[in-house]
A protein has these predicted regions:
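Acidic, glycine-rich calcium-binding repeat modules characteristic of RTX/beta-roll
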Residues: 143-157, 166
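A detector of tandem-repeat and repeat-rich interaction/domain scaffolds
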Residues: 131, 137-146
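Leucine-rich repeat
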Residues: 108, 130-131, 153-154
Length: 166
């Protein structure tokens, strides 16, 4: 069952959530079909094949062991830290990413070598501590969505004009 979790002052629904039992059923079905996998505090390792990964509140020790290069979507939730060394691993090992969502993570910079994500279509830096975008963002030729809401980015590099699909 879908439940309303937040309503604005005019009575419009702003956020919904799934009932816990339904959420667990959906997560198990996604895992069984190898469609998506959620790596959480309860599950500190993952072996197998999946194209979509959700990382929910795991420690850095888990993140640094994580090397599934076939992943196309990577979503982060409830992380206390996102070390620069993990970012280097991410940029080196996950070349097939199409979706990267850092919303609400403690991310404070985007490395210059971000241009290695040729297939990246969606990048969310919403509510992060990122202050500037690297000039290499102009090399993300397939980028269609760049979410900078509630981020600290105040200047956008001129190279962003090269992104025809944005």
């Amino acid at each position: 069952m879908v439940q309303v979790s937040k309503v604005n002052c005019s009575g419009k629904v702003r956020k919904c959530r799934l009932h816990d039992l339904l959420r667990e059923i959906i997560l198990q079905k996604m895992k069984d079909l190898s469609f998506c996998h959620t790596l959480s505090k309860r599950e500190s390792s993952f072996e197998g094949f999946t194209r979509h990964m959700s990382i929910d509140g795991v420690s850095y020790d888990v993140l640094k062991r994580f090397e599934n290069t076939h992943i196309h979507s990577l979503l982060f939730f409830n992380l206390d830290e996102l070390p620069k060394s993990f970012m280097s691993t991410l940029f080196a090992n996950f070349k097939l990413l199409k979706v990267m969502d850092f919303e609400d993570t403690p991310l404070d910079h985007i490395p210059e070598d971000m241009c290695s994500f040729f297939y990246l279509r969606y990048l969310s830096l919403r509510n992060t501590k990122v202050k500037m975008l690297p000039k290499s963002i102009g090399k993300l030729q397939n980028l269609e969505t760049l979410d900078l809401k509630q981020s600290l980015v105040s200047n956008i590099p001129i190279e962003i004009n090269k992104l025809c699909k944005l």
